[in-house]
């Protein structure tokens, strides 16, 4: 009898313990079921909170037509946000946008996509685990990335394949490692890249299709 009671007691402990094991989505995470819109000329400060995409937005794979977790409108700023997995299609920008200290723990379809012409500045933050590209540029723009760390991706920046519009890419004070293809890939003969004060290693061909390149004070390691 004592043996049976002991077995039942241990079974109860195991069952109770298993109920309190954390899932991949932690209690402090904010699960986003509908894209968060950052309105024109406003600032969204996530205060370091971690956001993950609900199934309504997408599964974070390379499947096309997933929705973003954040849509940032012209003149707006998104800052102090952590994007966990799944991140669906990350962040979409529409116009002149500032992205400050945003971290992508596991890039989904893309970390960020430029959807409308403008000046996009990414200052601080990091991104990793991108099976294809980290940043996707779909419209003519000036695209600046500074004080950023990127690791383990296909490409750091990709201009829309087959497009000929003009893009100016500016990379400053970044650390870029383990890109399978390149830092920047474009099919446009007019697009430019300017990279300064940046450390990089194992980045594939470095530049693919880029015909206008300026580099200064960079370190390969």
UniProtKB/Swiss-Prot annotation:
The keyword Calcium applies. GO terms for biological process: pectin catabolic process. Its main location: secreted. Pathway: Glycan metabolism; pectin degradation; 2-dehydro-3-deoxy-D-gluconate from pectin: step 2/5. Binds 1 Ca(2+) ion per subunit. Keywords: Calcium, Lyase, Metal-binding, Secreted, Signal. One of its GO terms (molecular function) is pectate lyase activity. Its cofactor is Ca(2+). Optimum temperature is 65 degrees Celsius. Thermostable at 50 degrees Celsius in buffers at pH 7. It catalyses: Eliminative cleavage of (1->4)-alpha-D-galacturonan to give oligosaccharides with 4-deoxy-alpha-D-galact-4-enuronosyl groups at their non-reducing ends; Eliminative cleavage of (1->4)-alpha-D-galacturonan methyl ester to give oligosaccharides with 4-deoxy-6-O-methyl-alpha-D-galact-4-enuronosyl groups at their non-reducing ends. Catalyzes the depolymerization of both polygalacturonate and pectins of methyl esterification degree from 22 to 89%, with an endo mode of action. In contrast to the majority of pectate lyases, displays high activity on highly methylated pectins. Is also able to cleave trigalacturonate to galacturonic acid and unsaturated digalacturonate. This is Pectate lyase C. The lineage of its organism: Bacteria, Bacillati, Bacillota, Bacilli, Bacillales. The gene is pelC.
């Amino acid at each position: 009898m004592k043996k049976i009671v002991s077995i039942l007691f241990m079974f109860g402990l195991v069952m109770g313990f298993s109920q309190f094991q954390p899932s991949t989505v932690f209690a402090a995470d904010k699960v986003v079921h509908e894209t968060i819109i950052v309105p024109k000329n406003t600032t969204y400060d996530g205060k370091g909170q971690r956001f993950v995409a609900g199934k309504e937005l997408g599964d974070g794979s390379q499947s096309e037509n997933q929705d973003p977790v954040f849509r940032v409108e012209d003149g707006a700023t998104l800052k102090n946000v952590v994007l966990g997995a799944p991140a669906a299609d990350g962040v979409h920008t529409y116009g002149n946008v500032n992205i400050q200290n945003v971290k992508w723990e596991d890039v989904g379809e893309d970390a960020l996509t430029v959807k409308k012409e403008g000046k996009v500045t990414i200052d601080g933050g990091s991104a990793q685990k991108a099976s294809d590209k980290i940043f996707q540029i779909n419209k003519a723009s000036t695209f600046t990335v500074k004080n950023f760390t990127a690791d383990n991706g296909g490409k750091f920046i990709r201009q829309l394949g087959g497009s000929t519009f003009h893009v100016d890419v500016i990379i400053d004070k970044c650390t870029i490692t383990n890109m399978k293809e390149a830092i920047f890939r474009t099919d446009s003969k007019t697009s430019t890249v300017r990279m300064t004060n940046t450390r990089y290693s194992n980045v594939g061909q470095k530049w693919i299709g880029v015909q206008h390149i300026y580099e200064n004070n960079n370190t390969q390691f």
